[in-house]
Amino acid sequence: MFPQRLDSTIAYDIAKAMMDGFNRHYQLFRTESARAKHRFETADWHGQQRAQRERIEFYDLRVREASTRLEREFKAGEQSMDVWHQVKLHYIGLLVNHHQPELAETFFNSVTTKILHRSYFQNDFIFVRPAVSTEYIENEEPTAQPTYRAYYPTRDNLREIIVRLVRDFDLRLEFEDLERDAGYVLEAVSERLSDVKLRANFQIQVLSGLFFRNKGAYVVGKIINGFNEVPLALPILHSKSGKLVIDAALFGEDDLLILFSFARAYFMVDMGIPSAYVQFLRSMMPHMPRAEIYNALGLAKQGKTLFYRDFLHHLRHSTDKFRIAPGIKGMVMLVFDLPSFPYVFKVIKDYYPPQKDTSREQIKGKYLLVKQHDRVGRMADTQEYSEVAFPRARFDDELIAEIEKFAPSQLEISDRDRDGNTEVIIKHVYIERRMIPLNIYLQEAFDAGVGEPAAKNQIERAVVEYGNAIKDLVAANIFPGDMLWKNFGITRHGKVVFYDYDEIEYITDCKFRRVPAPRNDEEEMSGEVWYSVGPKDVFPETFAPFLLGNDAVREVFMKHHGDLLDAEFWQSHQARIQAGHVHDVFPYEREKRFTRRHSPGRNDHELLTHLPPEPMLTGLSGMTP
């Protein structure tokens, strides 16, 4: 029970010190995010990548600072239960007019759980559930920007509105031809509005902060007409001339889901009220969990908090059991899942076969590398948890036996909370989105018969995407290491994503070689490797026997990605990266780029200047998504 009186002389001071720690964290986070605009304007791509890596570390640093201060100044760990009750109440009071209350609650949890015994990990002492609403938070200061801006175009002035909308972001680098680009956007919009009657509420709403990632800036918003809303994003890039261009117009939830995918690096965006951004983005992408939206915005700890709450809610409202995940078992990771829940749980094994020359700390280092690196839409993001408790009754006995055999150091089965419920406690686990393993996806097509048109299309799509995934990883200076089909998965949008990280290396750390010609018949006929192989040596031509055993797969692979078997391909990209070049990787199909859709010599007067006349009757169908 909470105390009826706030009579502690120290509780408020502890709460205030904790709030000071959070405010310092978010100010630093926001400042670094805001600097992304200048880095974009000056084409400081290496600085942008460095800032993205470093910003990930901000949170843990501030949590350590705050917990150290509380112990030093208040001996926080020695305070009574009654004092800690009051600390939470005072903290809630400090959140009343706060602009980031949900983040501050999570920060409170992070600091408190570093100090207190786990018996305190309940809603009386920490925020198991949120205490302060994030609805309708507004910054009332006169100079504050609103979360989003609304524009009210007509059929005649939509092109001018697009120009004004972009100029309102005050980018300090000149556009190559903004009027031309606005005409391109207008043409793309007109494809969705040409047969639509504009209603009284026709408007474009755009979030006030630009979204920066890698070499791009993104205008994010939505078009509203009648009962319909269509998500919209405009990528802004540097052209070869060094000026700015609008590169494409993205429409609809699917385009936005790919842009905000869990397989991409986090955005940098200056947000005064992050919950308002999340609410706006959720209205555009209702199928994207709020946890993943917070992750995409760089607020990964909040994403972890919401994910865990969603997970506990799902456990309470489901009855199926955790099981060994389907597919080929890994040599390093033990993977299990809950069939009704769209994520997998990965535990590092205690023992590895001799060919896996690695350690637990090395594997953790690889996963941290992926977390901090540009994932270019091809490496799944993971959430890392410690001391996770599951109901024992929900675990399949075969799964328990598997963990006891391969990862006994990571397993505890006990009634730790002394509440009469036996739990399975996993010491350390990674959680990531479930995908269809690529080997299973291909096997389904083989089983259907490679002569079937649908199966043939599935094989071609999978193999082409697999090669594209590897080439995108190469562009980002990542060598997957183990390139077997089983280490890649298919997402809901048909994208191939890599998810086995224990052997990844930087391209620049590898030595790509051709297999030397045999010097005699004995070497040529030998079943063993007769040439010297260094620890970082890679022989691309040796990939073929492991990947291309199926004729249908080989045909597609050699047609589209045969260069992956040539050491020269890898060496050329290695040289490019070492020379400091940052490659372009687009979070949308290249066919959507205006440079693909419009010929370079096209005259400006050929572009639309306004929407076509509206039809007499349109019903309620609204816009084409």
Curated annotation (Swiss-Prot):
Originating organism: Polaromonas sp. (strain JS666 / ATCC BAA-500)
Record carries keyword Kinase: yes
Reaction catalyzed: L-seryl-[isocitrate dehydrogenase] + ATP = O-phospho-L-seryl-[isocitrate dehydrogenase] + ADP + H(+)
Role noted for this protein: Bifunctional enzyme which can phosphorylate or dephosphorylate isocitrate dehydrogenase (IDH) on a specific serine residue. This is a regulatory mechanism which enables bacteria to bypass the Krebs cycle via the glyoxylate shunt in response to the source of carbon. When bacteria are grown on glucose, IDH is fully active and unphosphorylated, but when grown on acetate or ethanol, the activity of IDH declines drastically concomitant with its phosphorylation.
HAMAP family the UniProt entry points to: AceK
EC annotation from Swiss-Prot or TrEMBL: 2.7.11.5, 3.1.3.-
GO biological process, one term: glyoxylate cycle
NCBIfam families found in the cross-reference section: PRK02946.1 (NF002804)
UniProt key word Nucleotide-binding: yes
Subcellular location: Cytoplasm
Coiled coil ranges: none
Renumbered residue ranges of the record's region Disordered: 596-625
Active-site residues (renumbered): D381
Name the record gives this protein: Isocitrate dehydrogenase kinase/phosphatase
One cellular-component annotation, GO: cytoplasm
Family designation: Belongs to the AceK family.
Keyword annotations: ATP-binding, Cytoplasm, Glyoxylate bypass, Hydrolase, Kinase, Nucleotide-binding, Protein phosphatase, Serine/threonine-protein kinase, Transferase, Tricarboxylic acid cycle
GO molecular function, one term: phosphoprotein phosphatase activity
Superkingdom of source: Bacteria
Pfam families referenced in this protein's UniProt entry, alphabetically: AceK_kinase, AceK_regulatory
